[in-house]
């Protein structure tokens, strides 16, 4: 196994990162379409598009929770498996894969039950109003049934990428995304199912992707193979995976809490149109974040493998290249958003009033987008080298310590309450990047020094 993956420790980083990152970025871009295509179609439903879009936006906290729980296990399990491979311990790597799958199945069943039992209560908690609850409930009632497919697809695909099979991981996303894009207009418009059709198209697409992932990991081309005997015996290796994945879980789950805070505050100060605009803003933010995460995921096998192999020079070079690429991307996208906000907003809505409102809000909300590259590079490198505590602290600082309080503090400081709520995002991002950069500089140097001493 070590021989199979030795290219991670020998090929030039500048050639290796594009080789792994480009397919992952493409997969993330397609995954972005996967996540937002429902919103694009729903926002253009005649007569009810704006309210239906707002209803889907209210569902986002629950959808984010589902994604976060897949990361809870897999985002720690995949780097752990890479580290085991770097050490030549293939058996432990495969047990990690099996144990993580079992954990994901258990979690998905619990999540499905909770969402079906307390569906309406959760949707009202996350910002639904009497005008939007019916659309939100129709979508969530169907989407919840596909939770297990989402969990397994997102979770196991991380293990495919961690082995260096970036193109296979890309195909996983493309298969589901293309199918979803094709089925959405059929179910929403042709069959007249509306938001229910969007949810049904999504879970069918995820089920097909799930079947693809499992078939690959049970096949002959994979290095890490999914085996029945590891499903239970591998559970003993999952606690370190969960500890390492906790920061990514916090980062993603906190998006759910933050979405709830934004929705309820905006509903209070600006009504349904402000919540609908937030659905659009969060979609554009996904556009910014997913490719950054794709590059970081492409760098993860390189960093983790070389960290496990004790090659500090390649770990350092991997981070520097990751940081450069992420910064260039985030600055370029920030410029486009500032110059052409109506183009981004117009993808999700046809209502003139909503487009005008959301375009103004987008410039405020994405004001600090140009520094996202620093945050993502540092946080994901912490995960890649197994620094679980540092990655948790960074995630908690940005989301819980800064952003959530600012959502409620900013409206007390500014006369324009709605704009103040949106402004909480760039203020929190700026402060978080300063904190993260300082913490990373100190701890990354220590990690490299320890590697050199060994």
Spans of model-derived segments:
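Transmembrane helix-bundle signature of multi-pass secondary active exporters and lipid flippases
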Residues: 25-79, 143-150, 239-306, 326-334, ...
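Short runs within selected transmembrane alpha-helices of multi-pass transporters and secretion channels
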Residues: 71-74, 143-161, 172-177, 198-211, ...
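Small-residue-rich hydrophobic transmembrane alpha-helices
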Residues: 53-113, 150-169, 277-335, 339-341, ...
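Helix-loop interface residues and adjacent transmembrane-helix termini in multi-pass membrane transporters
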Residues: 33-36, 44, 50, 84-87, ...
């Amino acid at each position: 196994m070590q021989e199979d993956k030795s290219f991670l420790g020998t090929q030039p980083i500048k050639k290796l990162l594009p080789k792994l990152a480009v397919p992952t970025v493409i997969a993330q871009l397609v995954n972005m379409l996967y996540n937002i295509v429902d919103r694009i179609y729903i926002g253009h439903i005649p007569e009810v598009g704006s309210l239906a879009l707002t209803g889907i936006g209210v569902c986002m906290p629950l959808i984010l929770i589902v994604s976060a729980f897949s990361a809870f296990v897999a985002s720690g399990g995949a780097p752990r498996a890479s580290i085991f491979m770097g050490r030549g311990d293939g058996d432990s790597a495969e047990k990690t894969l099996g144990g993580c799958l079992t954990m994901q199945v258990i979690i998905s069943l619990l999540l499905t039950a909770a969402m079906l039992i307390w569906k309406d209560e959760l949707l009202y908690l996350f910002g639904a109003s009497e005008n939007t609850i019916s659309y939100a409930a129709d979508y969530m009632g169907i989407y919840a049934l596909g939770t297990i497919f989402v969990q397994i697809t997102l979770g196991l695909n991380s293990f495919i990428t961690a082995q260096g099979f970036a193109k296979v991981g890309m195909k996983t996303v493309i298969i589901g995304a293309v199918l979803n894009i094709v089925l959405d207009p059929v179910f929403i418009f042709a069959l007249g199912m509306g938001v229910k059709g969007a949810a049904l198209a999504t879970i069918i697409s995820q089920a097909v992707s799930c079947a693809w992932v499992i078939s690959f990991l049970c096949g002959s081309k994979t290095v890490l193979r999914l085996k029945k005997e590891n499903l239970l015996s591998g559970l003993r290796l999952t606690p370190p995976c969960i500890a390492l994945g906790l920061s990514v879980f916090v980062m993603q789950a906190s998006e759910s809490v933050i979405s709830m805070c934004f929705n309820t505050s905006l509903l209070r100060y600006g009504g349904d149109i402000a919540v609908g605009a937030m659905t659009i803003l969060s979609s554009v933010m996904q556009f910014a974040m997913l490719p950054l995460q794709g590059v970081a995921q492409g760098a993860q096998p390189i960093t983790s493998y070389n960290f496990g192999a004790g090659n500090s020079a390649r770990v350092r070079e991997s981070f520097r290249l990751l940081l450069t690429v992420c910064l260039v991307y985030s600055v370029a996208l920030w410029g486009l958003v500032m110059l052409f906000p109506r183009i981004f907003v117009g993808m999700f809505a046809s209502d003139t009033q909503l487009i005008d409102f959301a375009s103004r809000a987008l410039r405020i909300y994405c004001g600090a987008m140009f520094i996202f590259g620093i945050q993502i590079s540092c946080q994901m490198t912490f995960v890649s080298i197994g620094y679980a505590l540092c990655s948790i602290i960074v995630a908690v600082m940005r989301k819980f310590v800064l952003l959530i309080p600012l959502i409620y503090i900013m409206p007390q400081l500014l006369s324009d309450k709605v704009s103040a709520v949106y402004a909480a995002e760039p203020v929190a991002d700026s402060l978080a990047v300063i904190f993260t950069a300082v913490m990373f500089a100190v701890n990354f140097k220590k990690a490299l020094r320890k590697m050199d001493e060994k």
